[in-house]
Curated annotation (Swiss-Prot):
Residues in the signal sequence: none
Origin organism lineage: Eukaryota, Metazoa, Chordata, Craniata, Vertebrata
InterPro entries: Globin (IPR000971), Globin-like_sf (IPR009050), Myoglobin (IPR002335)
GO process terms (BP): removal of superoxide radicals
Keywords: Cytoplasm, Heme, Iron, Metal-binding, Muscle protein, Oxidoreductase, Oxygen transport, Phosphoprotein, Transport
GO cellular component, one term: extracellular exosome
Xref: Pfam families: Globin
Family that this chain belongs to: Belongs to the globin family.
Function of the protein: Monomeric heme protein which primary function is to store oxygen and facilitate its diffusion within muscle tissues. Reversibly binds oxygen through a pentacoordinated heme iron and enables its timely and efficient release as needed during periods of heightened demand. Depending on the oxidative conditions of tissues and cells, and in addition to its ability to bind oxygen, it also has a nitrite reductase activity whereby it regulates the production of bioactive nitric oxide.
Protein name: Myoglobin
Species for this entry: Loxodonta africana
Modification type Phosphoserine: residues: 4
Length: 154
């Protein structure tokens, strides 16, 4: 299910827009995730108390987490599918420490797509959306395979 060179080019061109404002994109992605899927908040001790979008946007911890998430994802995307070294520790921590279900990775992938559509409609057309969805699915599938190796039924 790999991506073509052209698809990776679209993914990385779009990701360049994210990198121009990682804090802003990260906050938007997490707020979208938590408002769309409030159950995901339970996996974050620092955010469990945040109930409204305003509270979420005011949280410095949430902003920092958004930067952490998108910085890690950017590093993985730049590997163009050759991300074994990056995926292993991420899967390990998400399976054994954080216990993050794969479904939640689907939710955040959807939030990322939504944010990119909202913030960059001209640059994030159908081809770029399809390529990004494919790249995020590859990431999730590889995390899921590692989860299975670790015996985590996430």
């Amino acid at each position: 299910m790999g991506l073509s060179d052209g698809e990776w080019e679209l993914v990385l061109k779009t990701w360049g827009k994210v990198e121009a404002d990682i804090p802003g994109h990260g906050e938007f992605v997490l707020v979208r995730l938590f408002t769309g899927h409030p159950e995901t908040l339970e996996k974050f001790d620092k955010f469990k108390h945040l109930k409204t979008e305003g509270e979420m946007k005011a949280s410095e911890d949430l902003k920092k987490q958004g930067v952490t998430v998108l910085t890690a994802l950017g590093g993985i995307l730049k590997k163009k599918g050759h991300h074994e070294a990056e995926i292993q520790p991420l899967a390990q921590s998400h399976a054994t420490k954080h216990k993050i279900p794969i479904k939640y990775l689907e939710f955040i992938s959807d939030a990322i797509i939504h944010v990119l559509q909202s913030k960059h409609p001209a640059e994030f057309g159908a081809d770029a959306q399809a390529a990004m969805k494919k790249a995020l699915e590859l990431f999730r599938n590889d995390i899921a395979a590692k989860y299975k190796e670790l015996g985590f039924q996430g």
